[in-house]
From Swiss-Prot:
SUPFAM superfamilies: beta-beta-alpha zinc fingers, FYVE/PHD zinc finger. One of its GO terms (cellular component) is nucleoplasm. Residues 148-163 have a biased composition (Acidic residues). It comes from Mus musculus. It is found in: Nucleus. Residues 146-193, 225-254 are annotated as: Disordered. The PHD-type zinc fingers mediate the binding to acetylated histones. This is Zinc finger protein DPF3. The keyword Zinc applies. One of its GO terms (molecular function) is zinc ion binding.
Length: 378
């Protein structure tokens, strides 16, 4: 037969008992808060639809024990049934009678009755979803418990996130709160700037290598720029120079006469309209298009190299080895001289574009360790 403990505090100790009760209360509060977040749900193990109920009590509801061995008592709460509106009994919630299609455009009473029905339904939902003050207080208590637990674990979570960032630097980063999230976003931006140094000055898109940026220029911005330049030339140029962009002008010796303006900023050699400084133009040997090296995103090596051979713009670019411009999606551009090479014309052939910078064999022999791909290309 079980013995009744009249005063359990003496058997366990006052401090131990208070700590045990506090831990039990904290655990039950967290458990109830987590369960209330998921309500209502269908329990897959028991097949019971779990819903909110009124069996949970708060600390302020405690009362002294009445029976021997009873520590606390809680007030009984009467069961109550939710108030519901029954459509058959409510005169405002009558079903609309089906009218012939001919009478629908003639009578507008259907619309008014329909709006009245909707308003009544909304009022019914408001009556059904009313929550008394005690239930709101219990919800607030649950939220306070969850917030306290989050504040305790916030420091540990941020430390774990800081340790995980280097391992997941190539994955999409989630938003973190506090200054740590700002630092991580700044580090992610600087890492992206380092990995993709070639940036489009028109839309700001970044690329790992120069061929990708050139392809982006050719297929995204060059066509729209040609249309804008043609309109500007029609409004500002004489009629005999309207087709200057489409038909290259040739001199007496048969060479193409280069344009005296940049196709990107429309400035001349005396001034780059983007930087405001004088800059020498680089012209295409086939069509005569010109551009500033900075507008073309040229490096120092590339700016010096294009003066040593007949440079071609992205529209006229052809393979140096085979001399054709077919299969332009297979063209590789050297990051030091901007020459084009088919991947299948190289020796040995290349199946996929290399990651990072790429230098041709001519630049390797000329620049050696100063080549852009030095240390990146085997």
């Amino acid at each position: 037969m079980a013995t009744v403990i009249h005063n359990p505090l003496k058997a366990l100790g006052d401090q131990f008992y208070k700590e045990a009760i506090e831990h039990c209360r904290s655990y039950n509060s967290r458990l109830c808060a987590e369960r209330s977040v998921r309500l209502p749900f269908l329990d897959s193990q028991t097949g019971v639809a779990q819903n909110n109920c009124y069996i949970w009590m708060e600390k302020r509801h405690r009362g002294p024990g009445l029976a021997p061995g009873q520590l606390y008592t809680y007030p009984a709460r009467c069961w109550r049934k939710k108030r519901r509106l029954h459509p058959p009994e409510d005169p405002k919630l009558r079903l609309l009678e089906i009218k012939p299609e001919v009478e629908l455009p003639l009578k507008k009473d259907g619309f008014t009755s329909e709006s009245t029905t909707l308003e009544a339904l909304l009022r019914g939902e408001g009556v059904e979803k009313k929550v008394d003050a005690r239930e709101e207080e219990s919800i607030q208590e649950i939220q306070r418990v969850l917030e306290n637990d989050e504040n305790v674990e916030e420091g540990n979570e941020e430390e774990d996130l800081e340790e995980d960032v280097p391992k997941r630097k190539n994955r999409t980063r989630g938003r973190a709160r506090g200054s740590a999230g700002g630092r991580r976003r700044h580090d992610a931006a600087s890492q992206e700037d380092h990995d993709k140094p070639y940036v489009c000055d028109i839309c700001g898109k970044r690329y790992k290598n120069r061929p990708g940026l050139s392809y982006h220029y050719a297929h995204t911005h060059l066509a729209s720029e040609e249309g804008d330049e043609a309109q500007d030339q029609e409004t500002r140029s004489p009629p005999n120079h309207r087709n200057e962009n489409h038909r290259p002008q040739k001199g007496p010796d048969g060479t193409v006469i280069p344009n005296n303006y940049c196709d990107f900023c429309l400035g001349g050699s005396n001034m780059n309209k983007k930087s405001g400084r004088p800059e020498e133009l680089v012209s295409c040997a086939d069509c005569g298009r010109s551009g500033h090296p900075t507008c073309l995103q040229f490096t120092l090596n590339m700016t010096e190299a294009v003066k040593t051979y007949k440079w071609q713009c992205i529209e006229c670019k052809s393979c140096i080895l085979c001399g054709t411009s077919e299969n332009d999606d297979q063209l590789l551009f050297c990051d030091d001289c901007d020459r084009g090479y088919h991947m299948y014309c190289l020796n040995p052939p290349v199946a996929e574009p290399p990651e990072g910078s790429w230098s041709c064999h001519l630049c390797w022999e000329l620049l050696k360790e100063k080549a852009s791909a030095f240390g990146c290309q085997a």
